[in-house]
Amino acid sequence: MKKQLNVLISGGGTGGHIFPALSIANGIKERRPDANILFVGAENRMEMEKLPAAGYKIVGLPVSGFDRKHLLRNVKVVARLLKSMHLAKKILRDFKPDIAIGVGGYASGPMLKEAQKKGIPTLIQEQNSYAGVTNKLLAQKANAICVAYEGMERFFPADKILVTGNPVRQNILNCTLTPQQARQKFGLDPDRRTILVVGGSLGARTVNNCIAAALDT
């Protein structure tokens, strides 16, 4: 009889972190239905709503990102980080994960750092072609680093890199709509050229606004 697999997945703050994390969790569940998965995110961020809605348990840390424009505000950020590291230790004691997976974002920093101190195997998943600060800091002691693009040796130890591509949700992979059906679904004119604009993370709004403004001129 297999020992129950305890998997801790940490990260979040934006959809760019949350949805790959959700895809990883779903993939683990497909292969190991008995797996016990716990998410750790940042308090008051979107993961605290999205992941329970998908049927997963999540714990929030009071962690936040550093303010690079207003340095004095970082006093509170450091205090939150220290508190988060203390809470991370308790989470590890209570949950006893077999592996800790970090997908980037505020919460994965203290969570994976504490896991590494305890000798728990850690895996990092980097979605972008330019690595985030948190993942770069965790890379040296990570057991494996899954990336979406070639050439990530400039950020991470080459011997730890696995080029896996980005995790994709199964409902997207299962989509069978034809281009014509997709245009109809979104109310687009099938006789006009269709342009898809995809922005990443919180910068998507700026990209969308620029494109919309350009189309109006």
Regions found by a protein language model. Give the residues of each.
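Donor-nucleotide binding loops and adjacent catalytic segments primarily
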Residues: 45-46, 50-54, 177-184, 188-217
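Active-site-proximal region of nucleotide-activated glycan assembly enzymes
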Residues: 57, 116-180, 188-190
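Short amphipathic alpha-helix
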Residues: 17-28
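Conserved nucleotide-sugar phosphate-binding/catalytic loop shared by glycosyltransferases and other
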Residues: 4-12, 30-80, 85
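Glycosyltransferases and closely related glycan-assembly transferases
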Residues: 87-101, 107-123, 136-144
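Cofactor-binding loop segments of dinucleotide-utilizing enzymes, especially the Rossmann-like FAD-
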Residues: 12, 42-44, 63, 127, ...
